[in-house]
Regions:
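Short amphipathic helix-loop junctions that connect adjacent transmembrane helices
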Residues: 31-48
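Helix-to-loop junctions at the C-terminal end of transmembrane segments
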Residues: 61-75, 163
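Cytoplasmic membrane-interface "Motif A"-like loop-to-helix N-cap segments
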Residues: 72-86
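A membrane-interface helix-boundary motif in multi-pass transporters
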Residues: 161-181
């Protein structure tokens, strides 16, 4: 199967597992950010809309910058930096719910979240390309997409379990998402994005750079 085949290629399976965790966290925070800022931070509906607009605006602008960074330092080092930024975003967001801090202290969060969001998608695909032989791209990108879809389902379900079923609250749910980012970071650290020689795998020996 495709999953078993992925184990033959160094770093690919680790990347896909890590991708599940960070995609789970990112997709979930996108879905529930509006509710969080109104119910936990104390923003009104209009300000919540402004938060989302700020995040999307910075995501668009930062996408061009992240592209240059990927070209310069490579997708792994870029994604590692993006995950560190997500750690700050999730920690800040959780603390905004746990602590009685003024609501204005939350405003840096949508800026950082937008920047991190564009960085995630800008570095994610080139990283996958570095780990996949050209002849196997079609096969493994199906697995790549499946990981993303599964994360998109499980993340909101986990959020609902924590917030609604267990009644632990949204700040706890955000803390769990922070843990998912930390796990993905730890999994990715050993995965090099240096060009591979696939000749001993029976595929092409050249790997396109991102």
């Amino acid at each position: 199967t495709t999953f078993r085949n992925s184990r033959k290629y160094p770093g690919l399976l680790r990347f896909l597992i890590a991708r599940f965790f960070y995609t789970d966290a990112v997709n979930t925070v996108i879905i529930f950010m509006g509710v969080y800022v109104t119910d936990e931070v104390g923003f009104g509906t209009q300000l919540a809309s402004v938060v989302m607009l700020i995040a999307m605006s910075f995501a668009v602008v930062a996408g061009f910058i992240w592209g240059r960074i990927v070209d310069r330092i490579g997708p792994k080092r870029t994604l590692i930096r993006v995950l560190r930024l997500w750690m700050i975003v999730f920690a800040w967001t959780a603390l905004s719910g746990f602590l009685p801090v003024p609501s204005w202290t939350f405003w840096p969060v949508p800026v950082m979240a937008g920047i991190a969001l564009s960085g995630t998608w800008t570095a994610d695909r080139p990283y996958m390309l570095r780990l996949t032989p050209s002849a196997k791209i079609g096969e493994f990108y199906g697995l790549y997409g499946m990981v993303g879809r599964f994360a998109a389902i499980l993340g909101p379900a986990l959020w609902g379990l924590i917030v609604n079923t267990l009644g632990l609250g949204r700040p706890v749910a955000v803390t769990i998402l922070l843990a998912a980012i930390l796990i993905s970071y730890a999994i990715l650290r050993p995965v090099s994005d240096s060009p591979r020689d696939w000749s001993n795998k029976g595929t092409d020996s050249t790997q396109p750079a991102s």
